[in-house]
């Protein structure tokens, strides 16, 4: 079952305003970033708060309203990316896509309605006041995402066809003519990481087949036919 985005108001009673973690089950605080505003779906950006990144989830707590806060498990985050494109959003931010439970009977878009249903929110943007911290946040996101791998379905294990692989497992010799694959960063302002099967709105990596090897093969066939005649 997908947990999705949810309310979070559990704060410690020592006056620090920090969130209560599930330490008994091994949850640890990994990073704290102050002065981070949040925008849910297409709704207006909210007043700044503090972002707490734990080994299990993201927690955003408002600095203005002590009774307001949001949380989402890393297992529910299908994609996170650094966005600096002003056409995509007005401020540099961490963009996230959140998995939600599909409800065929509910055709309304809760992201744009007055009544906020957090369980239907599919996108969340985290906007730090200091945009130079985006890379640090992205690195922490990646680290915590690796701590929460998506459970492997039994059918996938039995089928033996796992087509997921990393760039480190591929030949990335872009300068060699005989390289089978050439991997180049797509010329966009987004750096992305996907934790699931969701498609990216913009291509993060561009895989290109080096067609030179086919041209060489055609030349060899042509030379062979010439010698035979």
UniProtKB/Swiss-Prot annotation:
GO BP term, pick one: cell volume homeostasis
Transmembrane segments: none
Main location: cytoplasm
Any one annotated GO CC term: plasma membrane
Cell compartment(s), UniProt: Cytoplasm; Nucleus
Key words of the record: Cytoplasm, Nucleus
Pfam families xrefs: Voldacs
Record note on quaternary structure: Homooligomer.
Family: Belongs to the pICln (TC 1.A.47) family.
Purpose of the protein: May participate in cellular volume control by activation of a swelling-induced chloride conductance pathway.
Protein name: Chloride conductance regulatory protein ICln
């Amino acid at each position: 079952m997908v947990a999705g985005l949810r309310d979070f108001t559990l704060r410690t009673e020592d006056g620090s305003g920090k969130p209560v973690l599930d330490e008994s089950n091994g949850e640890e605080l990994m990073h704290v970033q102050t002065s981070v505003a949040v925008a849910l779906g297409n709704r207006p950006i909210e007043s700044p708060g503090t972002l707490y990144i734990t080994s299990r989830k993201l927690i955003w707590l408002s600095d203005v309203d002590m009774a307001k806060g949001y949380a989402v498990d890393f297992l529910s985050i299908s994609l996170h990316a650094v966005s600096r494109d002003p056409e995509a959003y007005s401020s540099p931010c961490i963009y996230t896509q959140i998995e939600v439970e599909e409800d065929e009977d509910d055709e309304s878009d809760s992201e744009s309605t007055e009544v906020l249903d957090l369980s239907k929110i599919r996108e969340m943007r985290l906007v730090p006041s200091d945009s130079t911290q985006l890379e640090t946040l992205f690195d922490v996101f990646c680290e915590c995402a690796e701590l929460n791998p998506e459970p492997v379905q039994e059918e996938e294990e039995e089928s033996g066809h796992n087509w997921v692989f990393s760039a480190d497992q591929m030949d990335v010799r872009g300068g060699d003519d005989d390289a089978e694959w050439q991997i180049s960063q797509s010329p966009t302002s987004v750096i992305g990481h996907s934790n699931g099967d969701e498609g990216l709105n913009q291509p993060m990596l561009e895989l290109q087949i080096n067609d030179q090897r086919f041209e060489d093969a055609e030349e060899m066939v042509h030379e062979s036919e010439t010698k035979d005649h």
